[in-house]
Structure formats: structure tokens, C-alpha cells
Amino acid sequence: MSTFEHPWGTLSLQRWPRRRNETLRAWDNADLYLLKALEERARGPLTLILNDQQGALPLAASGHGPVITAGDSFLALDAQVRNRRLNGLEEPGDHLWPFDRLAQQPDQVIMRVPKQLALLEWQLQWLSEQLAAGTPIWLAGMDKHLPRQLVPLMEQYLGNGRAELGWKKARLFSAAAPGERQHLAPYPSRVDGPMGALKVHAGVFAQQQLDIGARFFLDHLPTSLPAGARVADLGCGNGVIGLALLQQLPDCRLVFCDESWLALQSAAENAKTYAAGADCQYHLGDGLSGLDESFDLILLNPPFHDGHVVGDHVARRLFRQSKQALKAGGELRVIGNRHLGYHTLLGKLFDRVDVLGSNKKFVVWGCSQGGGLPAKPA
């Protein structure tokens, strides 16, 4: 936990989900730069906030006036809720998911520059369509994470944009809303999957082509399951792994799980195309948390990037959740880069960890408390 001093007071902020021996703060100087701009240049009380990460922006900006938040990440919204409770504040007000529309016009917009360039483009288009002409927009990020093409993209999608002075290794960018769409973002994109072309909405992993890890995983899916088996595609992205399983085993009941709203939207649209008659559900949340059920099979290709943070902390959390959510005799089937050494983590959690396939870069493991499921023959 760290103390966050901002223009309207002080907050105690904790990074969520919590990790042992956390070394990172729940805020950075890009947050402070945006709040400084809000304090000095706000046009009115109501602020729209995009891509807050841990609650620093909406909690602090509430000292200026009412806020509306918008973004794609469940974990970011959950962190805001938890930090509000930590500081004895009211539950958050309006939150807009990517396809939502503004119910009222904000006086200004503050926005963290997202890591994914595609999501940045899509959000700039969204702002151009939603905001009244002339509404001030301020974007910020840490220098080391900013894309070089940010100002050209602002000019393309908003009709204007400029970089301002750097401050404590952060940089601010400013624009005014054009009042109408200037350019159509090329999303969703489409990638080739084993069942056909798959939609991939902005910001979802593997925007231009199916990643090589997923391609290898597709060759090591189960060939049989109990009738009516309950399966989770954990961290589903565009849904290709779960959909490939449904192509082979259409009677299983599948839950697509992701913390990205746009990932689940991609999976849902692809399931409508390629698995229209299947029993599919969609869970927006922190992995399997919040699902009151157990599974015969969990399929997982865990990310090792959490925003700009690299590590195995996401995989560790999803491994633990999977162990708790498996039925007796159920299996976690997981793929990972060979150099990440997931077998050590998995061996500490599961009685049995079998290598089901490997190449120079990837390994597929079947993990169970006892027997597992049959692998697809090589």
C-alpha cells in the first residue's frame, strides 16, 4: 500500500490483485500529470476517465467533481472498487464498457494511453463519435511506454492533437473533440483459425494472426470428454481454443472466461458463427473467481504480460484458481513458453503433471489430482 498525494487530498492505494512482496505502486506520474491538467484547465465539473488502472484517477478526480469511467478491463474496475472501500468511499458511479454510449456529455476527458495500439485507435474513434465538438481531451503516459505515432493518430481520429512538455518521465497530450467521426478504425480485425476467419476486436491479443502458442495448443486438445462435460476456456481471448474443442466435442458445456470485455465480445461473436448450437456462457472477471461451479477440463494459455508488467504472477493466480475449480478427476491443460518453467509451479500444486507435447519453444502439460484426460495423438 502507498500514500497518493493529489491536488484534492490524500489516498491510500493498494495494487490489485494483491501480490506478495509487491514493489509497484498503484499510481504513477502519468496519473498525477492528468490530475494536474484537470485541476488547472477543467472546463466544468463532470469528467470522463478512460483506462484508469487501479482507481487513482477516479478516486482523486472525485475531489474536483463527478466522474464517469470507461474501459475494457474488469480487473481495473475491480481495483477501483477495492480502493474505494479501502478509503471509505462510495461505490463507483457510471462505468462504460466499450460498446456503451454516453448518457450525458462530460465537460472534459482524461485518458491513460493504453498499451495496445489497436485499443487506442478504437477509443479515439469512440471519443470522436461521442463527444460534443470542442470538449477538451488530455492523454498521458510514461515516456518509456508511449507509442511514437500517438500525435499522428490523434490527428487522424480527432482532427487535432499535440504533445506537451514532459514532467517526471511522463508526458501529456491534448486535443479537442471534433464532434463527429473523422476516421474509421479497422477493427474488429480477422485472423485465420482452424474453423475459419475469427473476429478480433481492438486490444485483444493476436490482432493480426493466430499466435504460434495457440496453434501448437490446438494440436494437443482432448479427443474425448464425459457426456455434458463442463469446460472453461480460461483467458479465452478471441475464443479459438474453446471453439476448436467444440468442433471436436460439440456436446460439452463451455464457459469462456476473460477479464477483457472486448475479448469476450470477440469470443461470443465467433461462437455465434462457428458454434451456434453449443452450450456457451461468458464470464467477465478475474479468471474463474465468481463462478460457483466446478469443471471437468480447464484450458489455459496464460499471459506473461500484465499491461507493461512482465512476470509469472498472472499464471500463478490462474493455476491456483484452476486447482480449486476442478472436479475430482478433472484436468488443467496448459501451454507455456519453455523458458518460463511453469512445470515447477504446477508440480507444487498438482499431484500429477504430464508433458503432453513439446517443441523448441512451447510445452503442453496435463495437470490433475490423480488421472487426467487423453491427449490428442501426435
Feature roles, as predicted:
Residues 158-194, 204, 337-378:
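Class I S-adenosyl-L-methionine
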Residues 2, 111, 115-193:
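N-terminal auxiliary segments of SAM/dcSAM-dependent transferases
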Residues 122-133, 316-328:
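A short glycine-rich, Lys/Arg-flanked "PGG" loop and its adjoining helix->strand segment in the class I
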Residues 26-92, 212-300:
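Conserved SAM/SAH cofactor-binding pocket of Class I
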Residues 261-262, 299-323:
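Mobile active-site "lid"/loop adjacent to the S-adenosyl-L-methionine
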Residues 71-75, 142, 258-263, 314, ...:
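Short beta->alpha hinge that forms the Motif I/post-I loop of the SAM-binding pocket
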Residues 19, 24-28, 33-37, 166-228:
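SAM-dependent Rossmann-like transferase core, predominantly class I methyltransferases
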Residues 108-118, 234-238, 295-308:
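Conserved proline-anchored active-site loop of SAM-dependent methyltransferases
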